Amino acid sequence: MLPAYPDCGDRWIDETVALEPARYNRTLVDAERSAQRFTERGGTGIVLRFGAFYGPDANQITNLIQSIRGGWAPIPGRPEAFFSSISHDDAATAVVAALQAGAGTYNAIDDEPLRRREYLDSLAQALGVPPPKTPPGWIAHLFGSLGRLLARSQRASNVCASKYPSNREGRPAILLERQARNAAPIARIS
């Protein structure tokens, strides 16, 4: 997820959308200003705004798989809200590509953001279990600025081509890799 963007509902987000960081990540704005000042002084300041990472060894994927197998998913926010992510492989590719890019700010995410419900249901389907229950959307507000930040709908656009257009395509690859490593047996991959 792109934690500093505001909740934009169904609207597309690009790098020109003003940031609204929460208390815990407001230093992102300072970091981006530093990159801009570096560029103004003749350097090549590059900012990559990553989505939520996923990969075979990602702790959040391991935890989410365990939760979904247990019938629930601790992802706050409205089920229809968008969720932007990026595979570890595509994130690495974006970093390498940035070495050749001009100064600027770039979203580094999958080409197609998924709605939270679609993200969770398709992962449950790949695991061969029923769709998980999720906490009601309003519960995120009980966790203050962090909860509200995590519940935002962020349908972000991406300028680079990804190996996996969305988590829907990337997930089977990471689940197969997990299975090959014997990290977590999988019932079915679709």
Which residues fall in each region the model found?
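Catalytic helix-loop patch of NAD(P)-dependent Rossmann-fold dehydrogenases
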Residues: 3, 7-47
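A conserved pocket-lining segment of Rossmann-fold NAD(P)-dependent short-chain dehydrogenase/reductase
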Residues: 18, 63-86
